[in-house]
Amino acid sequence: RRRMPFSAGLRREGPVVGPLRRRVPGAVSALSADLVRGPLVRATVLGSHAPGLYLDVAGAVVPVVTADAVPLATAVRLAVASADAPWRGLAAGDAVLVGEGLIRLPGCDIVAARTWRPARVRPVTHDPHSLHSSHMHSSHVHSSDRPTRAQAERCVAALIGRGPGLTPAGDDALAGILLVAHAHGVAGAVAAAVRALLTSTTAVSAALLDAAADGYAAAEVVALVDAAVAGDPAAVARALPAVLAIGHTSGADLVIGIAAALRHLNSLGHLCQTPASTTHTTPIG
């Protein structure tokens, strides 16, 4: 079978497309559908482990995750378990093809069979007659209480990219802050500052932060933010374990960011502390 040459610098040649290739159906996030269903392009593997494959597609990160992984907001989700993931052997720097509704791996085509819509935090609605109405709403945050661009940039610079791994601890905390701020309609300056510094962190983490700036996150995280913003302790207690179980410390760092944003929504310019610990549970509210 004829192999397709790829550009110099990539460690492998492109996959062979043939009649005996395995086909695995997947559900593509509405946030990534245009990339996966667009023209066929070369993509680069950013990272690979059993539950997930992270691809750079035309400068955007497209995660591909198994059924037992956290369903990231921009992900292509498969029904197979991580033990049967079709990307074994792929490593950072390898080349694959993405487009025309397919993710073409060596020996396997992942087919975008359907589209799924990721979870998004609910905007706060102020209802004085509702016990579950948030105690804080964007209409109650005076313009002088909102962070200036300079304040937001200083705070974001203190957190972004801080810590090891594909999603550093500082980024996870920032994601929690962004989600709460988006729910309250006050994310503008912080979101702009984060997007201006996305090159300061990993490509995978940058994609997660970009989604969080628009209120998107894994369903487990959105459930916790919605419960915390609504001031519903029972719902928080139900949602918290699933978030704390995310990654080695990512869930705990997200909780730190969520709690910090809830406590200091009127002074977001002071959210500059790097998470000191990810080994304990931070109360929310």
Where are these regions (language model features)?
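Short, Lys/Arg-enriched N-terminal segments with co-localized hydrophobic residues
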Residues: R1-R3
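Phosphate/adenylate-binding glycine loop and adjacent helical scaffold
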Residues: P5-S134, H140-R154, G165-G170, A183, ...
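Intrinsically disordered, low-complexity proline-rich regions
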Residues: S133-H142, G176, S277-T282
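A short glycine/serine-rich beta->alpha loop
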Residues: I160-P168, A211, P241-T249
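Conserved phosphate/anionic-ligand binding catalytic regions in large, soluble enzymes, centered on
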Residues: L166-A181, S250-L262
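A translation/RNA-centric and nucleic-acid-associated enzymatic feature enriched
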Residues: E220-L224
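Acidic, carboxylate-rich catalytic segments that either coordinate divalent cations
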Residues: V225-G285
